[in-house]
Each structure stands twice: as C-alpha cells, then as structure tokens.
C-alpha cells in the first residue's frame, strides 16, 4: 500500500472515530488535519476518551496563531501529565500548520491506547487479543482459519464471516464461498458498512494482493471488534430499556390505580386520623388509669408492708408478753405458795399466840398466887423483915416489856424457889434436930 493510500485509510478511520467520540458533546470534524488546529476540539476529544476533566483555562474561540498554539500546548501537556501518554516528534505548531502525517501518527498513538490496547480475549490483549477474538468469533465457518493479519484476510472469507456472524439475516455465507476473493472482500466491506457501521477503508484488490500494510488491517479489523462490543452494549441498553419500560408501565398502572383510589385513600386517611385521635385519647385515658392503678398498688403495697411490720412487731410483743406472762404466772404461783405459807405461819402463830396468851394468863395467875405465897412465906421469914417483897417486884418489872417482865418474874421465882427450898431444908434440919433433942 502506498503512503498516500495509507493516509486515506487512516484519515477515514480516525475521522469516524473522533466524530463518534465528539458526538457526545454535539461536535464533529470533517478534516482531521484542519479541524483540530485550534486545539479546542482536541481538548474536548481528550477529555471524552480519558474520562478526565481538563482543568486548565483555555481560549474557546482562538483567532490568532499564538492563541491556537497555547491551546494545543495545554492539550499536549494534559496528554503527558494527566494521561501519562508521551507522543514523540509532534508539537503544537504541527497542528496549526496542518501537518497531516504528524497528526495521523498522533491519532494512531491514541487509537492504539484507547481502541486496540483495551482489546482482550483470553490471555491475549492488543493486536494478539484482536487476532484471537477474530479466530474465536469465526470458529465453525468453512475455509476460515485466522492466524495472522497479513495472510488470513486476503481471501475475504474472514471478513465475510465476521459480517455474517454479526447479523446472519443479511446474507447466506455459503452463497459466497465459491466466489473469487475480490468479490468476497467487496461483499464483506459492503455488509460491514451496512450492518456494522464499519466504513470501507480498504481496497479489495490491495488486500487480496497482500499490499495493504498490517497497521491498516489492524485498524480496520479493530472496527469490527468495537462494532460487536457496541452491539452488545446496545443489547444491554435495550434490555435495560425494556426492563425500565416494564417498570414504568407497572408504575403507570400503579399511578392510575392510585389515582382511581385517591378519594378512597383520602377518606381512609381521614378515618385513620379520626381513629388515631380516638386511639390516642384512649391511650391517654388508659395511661392515666394505669398511673392511678400503679399509685394505688404502691399504696396497697406500702400498707401491706406497714401491716407486715406491725404484725411482726405485734408477734414480737406477744412473744414477749407470753414470756412475761409465764414469768408472772411463775411468780404468782410462788407468791401464792408464799401466801399460803405465810397464812399457815400466821395461823400457827395465832394459835401459838392464843395458847401462849392462855398459858401466860395461867402463868400470871400462878405467879400471882405464887407471889402471894411468897409474900406469905416472906412474912414468915425472919431474914426478910426490912421491906415488902411485892413492892420490890413491882418496882423491878414496872419499866420492862411484858415478855421481859415474865422472864424477870420467872428468874425471881426460881431464885425464890431456891431460897424457899433452902429455907425448908433448913427448917427440916432444925426440926430434925429439935426432935432429936426432944427424944433424948
């Protein structure tokens, strides 16, 4: 492939790619060499493919060359500092001067990073991953055996199989197996453009002859990979959209049902409010009743506790009283015994006193008689002529108590008896002596 042809292939491919990205911001280009020269759309493009915000201030409508160069310099610094992509041999002036070769090389570097390096199949990535993806996607198609970019795609069967696998309703693959390679390649490019949206970048004759360089083949084939991925993403979005539509339909039905029952709900709401107010009133009354009941229970428990303590105190006092009663009963029994003993003693003393009184009376009588006898004897006695006996006795006992008087009189009587006995004995002796003398 001549250098001019390669530029055409790249220009078509990169224009389509850049426009697919810029479309998200409502922008587009028609000439990659001219439309990126002021740096504005290049900055937008770099933001979109990287997902990073361009934070530097730049001129959105540069008129002078210096302003364009400043924008482009900021874009290249963003590419190197933020996106960590080093691009050799190109400067801001190359964009301003519309250096197509340098610009295409720049875009190829970006394309490899963001469109080829991201391809992954099995344990392979980049170009090898793309080749393995082609092999796996075309498995089962007659005559297709993907081994390399430079040899596999020359007969057109591989591209035709990729186009057919994407949408089998477009054509019958078997109808093209017997056609010549150029016819198959042209058919594949046509179906790829119609069915996959892959622009016709290659010439069938050059591909069949093997003069198309490998980079062009890689670039064109990568468009198939991304078309498949876009289809898968679209199917996922459609599934999500369908699911969302179902949910929206369900929500709409729910809203309609809710709309129909709105008045009923309002009525129920009012009824519930009334019921809630009633329940709140009942709850307040019930709470008040429970508080009063709790207070009464506390009072009852307090009274029961007081009664229990009083009962315990009463039981303690009764126990003490029973002990005191037993002691008193014992003391009473002892007192009664003592009383009986004293009464018996008093009775005995009374009887004894009566007997003693009677005896004393008799004794007094005997004493009086005896005193009379003594007096008589005294009168007879010669020794006692100086004073009378009774006056002496009366004088001696007049100041003494009765008992002492008795003792004193008894003593006197005993002394007198002894004196009388002695006197009688003396008289008897005298009488005996006189009798003896008279007998002589």
Curated annotation (Swiss-Prot):
Native source species: Heterostelium pallidum (strain ATCC 26659 / Pp 5 / PN500)
Name of this chain's protein: Cortexillin-1
Keywords noted in UniProt: Actin-binding, Coiled coil, Cytoplasm, Cytoskeleton, Repeat
Ranges in a coiled coil: 227-355, 403-436
Cellular localisation: Cytoplasm, Cytoskeleton
Region (Actin-binding): 1-227
Entry similarity comment: Belongs to the cortexillin family.
Pfam families the UniProt entry points to: CH, Cortex-I_coil
Cross-referenced InterPro entries: Actinin_actin-bd_CS, CH_dom, CH_dom_sf, Cortexillin-I_coiled-coil
Subunit structure: Homodimer; parallel.
Gene Ontology MF terms: actin binding
Predominant localisation class: cytoplasm
Domain Calponin-homology (CH): 8-115, 124-229
């Amino acid at each position: 492939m001549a250098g001019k042809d390669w530029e055409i292939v790249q220009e078509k491919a990169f224009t389509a790619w850049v426009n697919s990205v810029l479309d998200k911001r409502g922008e587009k280009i028609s000439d990659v060499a001219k439309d990126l020269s002021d740096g504005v759309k290049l900055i937008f493009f770099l933001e979109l493919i990287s997902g990073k915000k361009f934070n530097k201030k730049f001129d959105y409508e540069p008129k002078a060359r210096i302003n364009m160069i400043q924008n482009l310099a900021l874009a290249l610094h963003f590419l190197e500092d933020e996106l960590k992509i080093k691009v050799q041999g190109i400067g801001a002036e190359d964009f301003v001067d519309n250096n197509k070769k340098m610009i295409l090389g720049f875009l190829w570097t970006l394309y490899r990073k963001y469109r080829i390096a991201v391809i992954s199949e099995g344990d392979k990535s980049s170009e090898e991953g793309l080749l393995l993806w082609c092999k796996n996607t075309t498995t089962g198609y007659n005559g297709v055996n993907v081994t390399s970019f430079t040899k596999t795609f020359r007969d057109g069967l591989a591209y035709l199989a990729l186009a057919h696998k994407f949408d089998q309703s477009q054509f019958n693959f078997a109808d093209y197996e017997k056609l010549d390679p150029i016819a198959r390649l042209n058919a594949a490019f046509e179906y790829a453009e119609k069915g996959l949206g892959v622009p016709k970048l290659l010439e069938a004759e050059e591909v069949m002859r093997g003069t198309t360089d490998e980079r062009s083949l890689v670039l064109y084939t990568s468009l198939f990979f991304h078309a498949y991925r876009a289809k898968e993403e679209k199917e996922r979005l459609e599934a999500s959209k369908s699911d969302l539509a179902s949910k929206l339909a369900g929500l709409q039905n729910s809203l309609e049902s809710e709309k129909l029952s709105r008045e009923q709900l309002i009525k129920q709401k009012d009824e519930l409010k009334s019921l809630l107010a009633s329940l709140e009133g009942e709850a307040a009354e019930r709470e008040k009743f429970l508080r009063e009941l709790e207070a009464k229970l506390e009072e009852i428990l307090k009274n029961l506790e007081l009664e229990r303590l009083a009962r315990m105190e009463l039981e303690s006092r009764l126990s003490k009283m029973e002990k005191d009663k037993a002691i008193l009963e014992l003391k009473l029994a002892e007192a009664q015994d003592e009383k009986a003993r004293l009464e018996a003693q008093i009775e005995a003393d009374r009887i004894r006193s009566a007997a003693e009184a009677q005896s004393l009376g008799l004794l007094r009588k005997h004493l009086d008689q005896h005193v009379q006898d003594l007096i008589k004897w005294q009168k007879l006695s010669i020794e006692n002529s100086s004073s009378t006996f009774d006056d002496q006795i009366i004088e001696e006992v007049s100041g003494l108590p009765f008992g002492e008087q008795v003792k004193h009189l008894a003593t006197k009587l005993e002394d007198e008896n002894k004196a009388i006995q002695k006197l009688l004995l003396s008289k008897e002796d005298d009488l005996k002596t006189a009798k003896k003398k008279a007998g002589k």
